């Protein structure tokens, strides 16, 4: 456990945000009570929590600090001629109607199906300007760490905790340890934040960040856009971390300015002044540190059944026989058996059946633009779904003609939603199929029973779409 700094010691941004939100300090026998600034909810993990509130006759403590959307189980196909949404089953439709009722009954602001602001929760929240530096942010979703890109302390919570926050606006939490990931150099052509985070997870392993909050530092991180920073923080959980964040700077402030929930006028100036004090103090110490050189990286892709099993697209499928640790060797053997891959064989050239471009990891406008760079003037050789992360992303992309590029390439341009990332809405792959996906998890069956997922960036996914196989996006863009 990181120790609380006294007033004279340099503090990390993690310490600063944590200390500012402690309602009751933790003890050896009890976790801290932490105040929550923003609670995001969606239709899958909130129904049970609202039911408990009803049963106990409770109201929301701070309804204005709760914001709702729909994303997990909603269709990404448009309404039918009868005006109805094509839900995959009755359960999905019931989740949506129950969400509408819950938000109406408890006074929660909801941006649901058909709303121009609706989107995947971790795309929608920042677009609304609801996510701001120095906040504590929670959501009943694993990838809430996305909001850490704004210098917020953001983490996923379980359904029972969703109920706790709705009723009290507080949460029981143990103070996390701190991990600094410093990234020197600069990402080369054809690389993005997705390649960087896959490389970091490959180095740390899926349990390397357990019990920690990661702060991403260094020139390569500072050079990222806000979209890139959100991608980076989004997958912190895949290294086992509780959360991940990037300290706010002018890039952050410029992105937030003018958004619906961002402060306005004099309040904006006051907020920016506060936010500028958030970055870690010079001399602040961390429990652990990791250093990488971005200029040494190549486009990444996963080959196995967890996000830590990643290699360069130019690399070879690892051989379990070279693994000294017996447990790690067994894990690798099982992964390759499920994936049907041969040790020592190049990953490039592996046949692909489906490509998915979207999700809370890579469903933003920058991701749509990157995919379009590869798709423009080419034809896809495999089924390809491009799913914007929100209606705002969709609208902006269509204004730029990206939808036309996607359709002319033979790919599908869909409505916003989680879609094939979690495959709850009918967007899935069949057993044995290979899918290059810009999402965040490649667990067995994640995209459909027996489906095989390879995680990659939008550029690498689009390169797979137009070649029908795993390919180096740099070579595709160069016309080779």
Curated annotation (Swiss-Prot):
Main enzyme class: lyase
Cofactor field: [4Fe-4S] cluster
Coiled-coil annotated spans: none
Residues that hold [4Fe-4S] cluster according to the record: 360, 418, 421
Classification via PROSITE patterns: ACONITASE_1, ACONITASE_2
Entry EC number(s): 4.2.1.33
Catalytic activity: (2R,3S)-3-isopropylmalate = (2S)-2-isopropylmalate
GO molecular function (one): 3-isopropylmalate dehydratase activity
Keywords per UniProt: 4Fe-4S, Amino-acid biosynthesis, Branched-chain amino acid biosynthesis, Iron, Iron-sulfur, Leucine biosynthesis, Lyase, Metal-binding
Taxonomic superkingdom: Bacteria
Family (UniProt): Belongs to the aconitase/IPM isomerase family. LeuC type 1 subfamily.
Classification via PANTHER family: 3-ISOPROPYLMALATE DEHYDRATASE, HOMOACONITASE, MITOCHONDRIAL-RELATED
Role noted for this protein: Catalyzes the isomerization between 2-isopropylmalate and 3-isopropylmalate, via the formation of 2-isopropylmaleate.
The protein, known as: 3-isopropylmalate dehydratase large subunit
Organism: Anaeromyxobacter dehalogenans (strain 2CP-C)
Lineage summary: Bacteria, Pseudomonadati, Myxococcota, Myxococcia, Myxococcales
